């Protein structure tokens, strides 16, 4: 991932999942979620983005620190399928700042990076209060994924 940040501007294409099973807007069709995400990823790759990130942006309310297991499991399955077809850097983001779940998912699917919304600063909003987590991920360097603070940069592993 270090070569990804060579000083040139990059475009990271976002694959926003449809609402996941723990969400009130979930329509009960996990195959539709998978297919929609794969089509988005293929389109982004075909359009020449530099990297892809998978995110559960359509889940409301967004939970602070972790998401329900049924959503996490389906999101991990989708991430694995996207990783299999993705020849460019691939990352995951779980709203809001589910750093530990993101780290484990990235490790499980061989993702290249994660995105953390509250890396060095505390955040508050409709999701509740999220303390900065910059010290906690450093204890989990057993995986090869790279992590990035929100709009701040990051550290290589």
Regions found by a protein language model. Name each.
Residues 2, 7-8, 13-14, 63-92, ...:
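Alpha-helix-loop-beta-strand connector modules within alpha/beta enzyme cores
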Residues 16-39, 90-98, 155-157:
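Active-site mouth loops of central-metabolism enzymes
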Residues 48-74, 120-128:
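Glycine-rich, proline-tolerant flexible connector loops at the mouths of alpha/beta enzymes
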Residues 27-34, 68, 72, 130:
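Flexible, glycine- and charge-enriched loops at secondary-structure boundaries
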Residues 36-48, 81-84:
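A short, N-terminal amphipathic alpha-helix
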Residues 13, 44, 52, 114:
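Conserved, mostly hydrophobic/aromatic
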Residues 75-108, 113, 123:
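Glycine/small-residue-rich loop that forms an oxyanion/phosphate-binding "nest" at active or ligand-binding sites
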Residues 17, 100, 104-157:
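Conserved anion-binding
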